Amino acid sequence: MVGKSVVTLDGLSTNQILDLLHKAEYIDSHRKEIAHTCDGRVLATLFYEPSTRTRLSFETAMLRLGGKVIGFAGAQLASVTKGESIADTLKTVSNYVDVVAIRHPKEGAALVASRAASVPVINAGDGGHMHPTQTLADLATLQSRFGRITDLTVGLCGDLTFGRTVHSLIETLCRFGNVRFVLISPDELKTPQYVIDRINATDSCSYVEVRDLASVIGDLDVLYMTRVQKERFFNEDDYLRLRDTYILDEEKLQLAKPSMAVLHPLPRVNEIAVDVDDDPRAAYFEQVKNGMLVRMALESTVVGDELPGYEPLNPKEVQA
């Protein structure tokens, strides 16, 4: 993985993904030992789209590893306002840094960036396409909660059309197999066909599509809530009509298993009531911490800096 860009998780083997999760666990319990792993390294965060958590998570990850950070937040702060292409920006920035994290509203932008850059590029979200590091955070949370990322019934609820985190998670879980997906959404925000095709292509995975959360919540091991994203709508009336379709509160949680985990990529609007936050099944703030840890694992890996004392799960496979 040294020197490789991560645009989607498809470029990583399942063993490499598992090793990143294992590495994140190691980092969490060895904070002092790894604090100088990336001394002298510089990360560029090129965020053409607004973000708080993802950008701060990438930046904190490098800072906790001993490195430094440069970058911008918002297209209005970039040379794109002068007409500069993504490719030219990446060719320029590659001369300054060791690794780039890029977020862009257009699908495919991260791939364009990775082809232009001479340093590893990590996709921090490109349009409605993919968000690989959020998926790693999701997987790390499942691993922490259940000790596994297979043999689970996973409900995904809300905006399943534009939610890039949903698409990334489904496609990656299909690679590991043995997952039952319950896709909960209004007809206007159903899962795209290419994601359904991915589930159908995996013999050990299955899915059902439903509109009613309450009717299926008792069957779920995981409930992955999403917000209806206003920025993806051209018509505000459509957004307002769909915004409050699904709201998880303590009343609905009473129908769920005591062991169920509630995940959410954040930010939330009103789709999870605040009274759910204190429920032991609420795992979305754990995801935030896990997101930083997996980004620390990924950043140190792609620049080739080894964590002191860390033993890979399968050295030959992981180093490929």
Swiss-Prot record:
Pfam families membership: OTCace, OTCace_N
EC number: 2.1.3.2
Reactions catalysed according to its record: carbamoyl phosphate + L-aspartate = N-carbamoyl-L-aspartate + phosphate + H(+)
Presence of keyword Protein biosynthesis: no
Keywords recorded for this protein, A-Z: Pyrimidine biosynthesis, Transferase
Associated pathway: Pyrimidine metabolism; UMP biosynthesis via de novo pathway; (S)-dihydroorotate from bicarbonate: step 2/3
Annotated L-aspartate binding sites: K82, R164, R227
Protein name: Aspartate carbamoyltransferase catalytic subunit
Gene name of this polypeptide: pyrB
